[in-house]
Amino acid sequence: MPFLWLCWALWALSLVSLREALTGEQILGSLLQQLQLDQPPVLDKADVEGMVIPSHVRTQYVALLQHSHASRSRGKRFSQNLREVAGRFLVSETSTHLLVFGMEQRLPPNSELVQAVLRLFQEPVPRTALRRQKRLSPHSARARVTIEWLRFRDDGSNRTALIDSRLVSIHESGWKAFDVTEAVNFWQQLSRPRQPLLLQVSVQREHLGPGTWSSHKLVRFAAQGTPDGKGQGEPQLELHTLDLKDYGAQGNCDPEAPVTEGTRCCRQEMYLDLQGMKWAENWILEPPGFLTYECVGSCLQLPESLTSRWPFLGPRQCVASEMTSLPMIVSVKEGGRTRPQVVSLPNMRVQTCSCASDGALIPRRLQP
């Protein structure tokens, strides 16, 4: 029975939408998971009477409180503008290129990124080279193109993150599009002043084995403009963004105005009283209650001209885009003695409400 009780609590926690108000059941489910308990402990008043919270426990609790107000975790982010950034090849080797894009002031203020597309121009392969390749490697006519985001760290080392990878035919030529939205999301998380956006383009064999070594060498991307001097072959980075002045949320709700269907997406303040919950009695020492928030209201939907361009995006909804943790002091009974313990429940309080679409990319957090 206790196991079934825990399963129910965690199931209820998983069903909660990011736009709904935080409930006592969610707090309980997270606490049970954090403390690895099957059910809430039953503590008598005598167990906690006269208990003094040590200064180091109080200090830890206050530090977590301060950190929760400064540290935020991002949830789903969603960003009619199209901007192209010309890139240049910094390094060109047999099968690896490093593209450099100057990004400062390229993203409009008060906007969010919907999609970033890298366009590379694949040069046609001379017919003589194709005939020779077919004679030497008849079963290999494709190569794998991989896009990675490259980051140089302060200590001089570098890290890469896989962004996109696909097979291209040596018999094709023209513009090839790669989705590099995640790379731009990573770049946005860098501290200022930000380094340029670095994208590493690698051309490799489709698979290992004899007779496949030469095909990938025939795949080449234009590094400069076409012979007519118009620069049409240069690598291009397209940035698709939405103006949040029209499509974003408004911040905190007006406490004097009732929330209706026409209310623009906002963060509504609420108070969760833990003292009034039976399961928290004699177990939750701090806080007795706290301010919590929910995301309410509606969002302006995209016009048909944009939904047809981005068919992967669903209806826009008012959701929590940034969450923060909730520190607590609880009573823990061990060996007949009761002591206070600090726990921190992640993603419990809404910090920011935003308008987002189903299907929008959820960015990965940038690792140190």
From Swiss-Prot:
Disulfide pairs? 253-266, 265-318, 295-353, 299-355
Write out the function statement from the record: Required for left-right axis determination as a regulator of LEFTY2 and NODAL.
PANTHER family from the UniProt entry: LEFT-RIGHT DETERMINATION FACTOR 1, TGF-BETA FAMILY
What do the Gene Ontology cellular component annotations say?
extracellular region; extracellular space
Concerning its family, UniProt says: Belongs to the TGF-beta family.
**Major localization class:** secreted
Q: Which residues are glycosylated?
A: 158
What InterPro entries does the record point to? Cystine-knot_cytokine, LRDF, TGF-b_C, TGF-b_propeptide, TGF-beta-rel, TGFb_CS
- GO biological process assignments: anterior/posterior axis specification; cell migration involved in gastrulation; cell population proliferation; determination of left/right symmetry; heart morphogenesis; negative regulation of cell population proliferation; negative regulation of nodal receptor complex assembly; negative regulation of nodal signaling pathway
User: Source taxonomy lineage?
Assistant: Eukaryota, Metazoa, Chordata, Craniata, Vertebrata
Q: Which UniProt keywords apply?
A: Cytokine, Developmental protein, Disulfide bond, Glycoprotein, Growth factor, Secreted, Signal
Where in the cell? Secreted
The name this protein carries in UniProt is: Left-right determination factor 1
The stretch of residues making up the signal peptide is: 1-21
Q: How is it modified after translation?
A: The processing of the protein may also occur at the second R-X-X-R site located at AA 132-135. Processing appears to be regulated in a cell-type specific manner.
Q: What molecular function terms (GO) are annotated for this protein?
A: cytokine activity; growth factor activity; nodal binding; transforming growth factor beta receptor binding
Q: Which residues form the propeptide?
A: 22-76
